[in-house]
Amino acid sequence: RWFATHRHSVVRAKKEDEPQGHQDGRPRREPTEKEKRIMEYQQNAPKLSFAEEAKSQITFGNGYGVISTITKDDYPGGAVVMYAPDDDGLPAFSFSTMSGHTQDLMKNSKASLTVTSNDFKGAADARVNLVGDIEKITDEEELKKYREIFIKKHPNAFWVNFGDFLVFRMTSLKHIRYVGGFARAATIPPGEYLEASADPVMEFAEKIAGHMNEDHQDATKLIIEHQMGLECESAEIKNVDRLGMTVFVTVKQPDQTVSSPFKLRVGFPEEAPDRVGVRNMLKRMTNEAASALKAEAEEEEAATTTPPSSSTSS
């Protein structure tokens, strides 16, 4: 139960109007050595920068997001739209002249785009919000360029060349709000986002995670047990990048019930630059974990079966 309690306490700690310490009347206990080990591992596990995570999500997302525009009544309006990222990770769009958000942008370019992770299910999953100006493209060369960018992301969007569809792009980026899940959030300066590169492994993250979850979940559980000393009931990889992977796990609690899923970061011993590198890294980590845990089990067995030494008197 500690994992769920600790996870939510991280979120609560940011709310100044809630009681802190023992003020809420609930008893507090010191974490066990195992819990301390897991906490320390999580603090030190290698992670992408917020800018890299946000850029990767925009770049390798499914190309859909929620655009928010200023309506004629000066209220925010939202719509689910298709987008395509350019080389800077800024979104381009193709909108019908009849759409409400098209009319909004023609009058006021201030807007934002919110993109969630492809498998978004709730507050523990990642989302990014780009805020800036979205303007219609009028230059013929730019128009050709951004139509090609859009078609590359959405090959079936043949209507992008229709006369009643206009091409827009985000021309200025004011700020980026990124939330990677519980207790992982940041406002990213535009310069950091523009300079960051999308992580090359995240392009294949869904395929890697799907394969591991379907065929090799025992290997993931083995790696976590070796790295953190935590035996999992289930371990579902949610994301993979060159530095490691994010895993949703459940554990058996003292009352023998299974916990709610919670997120763990599992770092790689070294960077995996591509899909093949990740595969090799996971094989290596699985073999190392199996060998180490086998050796530990043999040591424990030897300690319990070795008879105590007896002293003899002369």
Model-derived features with residue positions:
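N-terminal chloroplast transit peptides
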Residues: R1-A4
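Binding-site signature for planar aromatic cofactors or substrates
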Residues: H8-S314
